[in-house]
Amino acid sequence: MFGGSINEGTIDDVVAEARQAEADGFASYWAPNIFGHDALTALAIVGREVPRIELGTSVVPTYPRHPSAIAQQCLTVSAACGGRLTLGIGLSHKVVIENMLGMSYAKPVRHIRDYLSILGPLSRNEPVSYRGEDYSTNLALNAKGAPPFGIVVAALGPQMLKATAELADGTLTWCTGPNTLADFTVPTINAAAEAAGRPAPRVIAALPVCVTSDTEAAKGRAAKVFEIYGSLPSYRAMLDREGAAGAEDIAIIGSQDEVVDRILALAAIGVTDFAAVEFPGNPDEAVATREAIKQAMS
């Protein structure tokens, strides 16, 4: 389940949303890290209040945070939530990193390889000595009682998927449709993991979901709500690969049975986890959408 309260609500709202996701039987609760509350800090609080569900970030931008700093923070969060943390990280976008933050977005694949080469050992509380082009570290952390945390990467292109397969636990996709997942994402990351002698990676697919009797209205709403993603190059490439004009063309929209069937079909193409991004148009659609997701996940 993909949470929205972290950007639109209070920390109490985030806790309540995660608690409801756990009560509804979902395996994971994913908190985005955009311009609202800090996802990792929020999940440390959630982890003390909500006892069982996996807690993940989707995703924390890498460029503003040194890998050793985020490793220390994540070990602390992992200790707070009893080892249920999965860190989702991503490059963010050139417009954010360069225009908003004034940092270089050059050579993103080199950046993520250096980043993961440092973050991986530290995530297991192991010392790391690494010299790369973007990052160099000689460090050991001492977070007593902190369980290791998982790492997934918002990897979309082939080189990012290869780096992720070799150095992380899986990918978390967005704006990536079922045909692209089946024909490109899943086989690319699985082949790279096999070639590297790594375990089969997680493929976590996040997609918009709405149960409705008015499909056209829901598509129109999705086009507005998710409009920005079509203008960001990494997502635009995935939409183009799918032959989609925008997120509305890959959103899971329809009757309850249709939505359940489309979610279940993702598992058949190699998606290991599904993260629903609900966008109901009214309270009845909200209830029906949640029920369909629960049915598909049961």
PLM regions with names:
Residues 1-298:
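Active-site-adjacent structural elements that line small-molecule/cofactor binding pockets in enzymes
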